[in-house]
Amino acid sequence: MGPGWRAPSAALVGGSVALFGALRRAALALPRPAAVRSRPGRVWRWRNLLVSFAHSVLAGLWALFSLWQSPELLSDIQDGYSVSGHLLVCFSSGYFIHDSLDIIFNQQSRSSWEYLVHHAMAISAFVSLIITGRFLVAAMLLLLVEVSNIFLTIRMLLKMSNVPSPALYEANKYVNLVMYFAFRLAPQVYLTWYFVRYVEVQGQGAFLMANLLLLDAMILMYFSRLLRSDFFPSLRKGSVGRDVDGEKFLID
């Protein structure tokens, strides 16, 4: 991918930011559960999660379809290229920029600082991919995580809305766990192994390796929280009486 792609890519990222801004405004008009309406602190989080859900559905299925359509890309993680994958990276870059701005402008930085760290890592990594045209397939593999995020976001929306159907939450709990292994942990483990074994640790390779290792630590931390919350609640510490208002990440 030559330099001629850079200006169109910037326009695509900007268009994605605008698209998610429009989705955010549309989410304001959607009906909200009584449990959300009665707690002002939850209104922003509910709307933010709806936009996040839209990104997860679109990006997760997009990544899955792109890799299914072109499986040969998996044999060239460093230099493989597809137009679909390039558009996907621009699309998700726009979402991460939009979500970061949404968090900051709505004064949620303190409660959602982990997302800001994650988004800064993702944006910087994706920009480097767009500029160099390398490791695009690695980004596509990482974006499979959005399939897992579909069910993780459903989990959080169910908790916030106090849905009176424990069976629905229980079913999603187990599906969420399976998806976490299949689309979050498995691609992450494979990419970490690949980078350690095959990628030269200098320049862009070193930068992406550092991002990947930090992401490994974050994913394991979130997995620990998920297990404690949904499967071993007796092991939770300091969560009694904790309010979820404004909290964007999985902490309860």
From Swiss-Prot:
Residues 30-47, 106-124, 146-174, 224-252 are extracellular. It is a multi-pass membrane protein. SMART domains: TLC. Residues 125-145 dip into the membrane without crossing it. Residues 1-29 form the signal peptide. Residues 69-84, 196-202 are cytoplasmic. Coiled coil: none annotated. GO terms for cellular component: plasma membrane. It is found in: Cell membrane. The chain crosses the membrane at residues 48-68, 85-105, 175-195, 203-223. Interacts with CACNA1C in vitro; however the relevance of the interaction in vivo is unclear. Regulates the composition and fluidity of the plasma membrane. Inhibits the incorporation of membrane-fluidizing phospholipids containing omega-3 long-chain polyunsaturated fatty acids (LCPUFA) and thereby promotes membrane rigidity. Does not appear to have any effect on LCPUFA synthesis. This is TLC domain-containing protein 1. The lineage of its organism: Eukaryota, Metazoa, Chordata, Craniata, Vertebrata. The gene is TLCD1.
